[in-house]
């Protein structure tokens, strides 16, 4: 049986999770990363995607994250989200609103670095819209 570790998942709106877990899969910018107890210390940027949590009880939870930052130590994972919601609370309207805002910002942006980040965000949001939210 895998060891458990402390997991804090925080967004500006609320504390989503603060409890013992056995495993968390996060959408890091370098690719999906599975975090377990005794993980090497790491700090990474989180891209929009799905966070999958395996709780100490054996239950699994899925959350959509819209970007953020992860601080990983051997005993703890702290996930600071720009915004996040449980998958079952996500609506097509929420995703479409974020996509439209990003498109409008992209149209008004001339900075190449910012345009690239917006294009990556739009790609992730479009993918989530097609995969997670039923028509």
UniProtKB/Swiss-Prot annotation:
Any one GO molecular function term: ATP binding
Entries under CDD domains matching the protein: F1-ATPase_delta
Domain of life: Bacteria
GO cellular component, one term: proton-transporting ATP synthase complex
Keyword DNA repair assigned: no
Record membrane topology: Peripheral membrane protein
Similarity comment text for this entry: Belongs to the ATPase epsilon chain family.
Protein name per the record: ATP synthase epsilon chain
Naturally occurring in which organism (per UniProt): Allorhizobium ampelinum (strain ATCC BAA-846 / DSM 112012 / S4) (Agrobacterium vitis (strain S4))
Gene name of this polypeptide: atpC
């Amino acid at each position: 049986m895998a060891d458990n570790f402390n997991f804090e998942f925080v967004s500006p709106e609320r504390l989503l999770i603060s409890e013992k877990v056995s495993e968390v899969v996060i959408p890091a910018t370098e690719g999906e990363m599975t975090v377990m107890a005794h993980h090497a210390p790491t700090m990474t940027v989180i891209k929009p995607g799905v966070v999958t949590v395996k709780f100490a009880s054996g239950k699994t939870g899925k959350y959509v994250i819209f970007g953020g930052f992860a601080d990983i130590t051997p005993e703890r994972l702290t996930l600071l989200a720009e915004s996040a919601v449980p998958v079952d609370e996500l609506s097509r309207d929420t995703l479409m609103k974020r996509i439209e805002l990003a498109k409008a910002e992209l149209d008004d942006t001339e900075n190449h670095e910012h345009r690239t980040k917006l294009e990556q965000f739009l790609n992730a949001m479009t993918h989530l819209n097609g995969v997670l939210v039923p028509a």
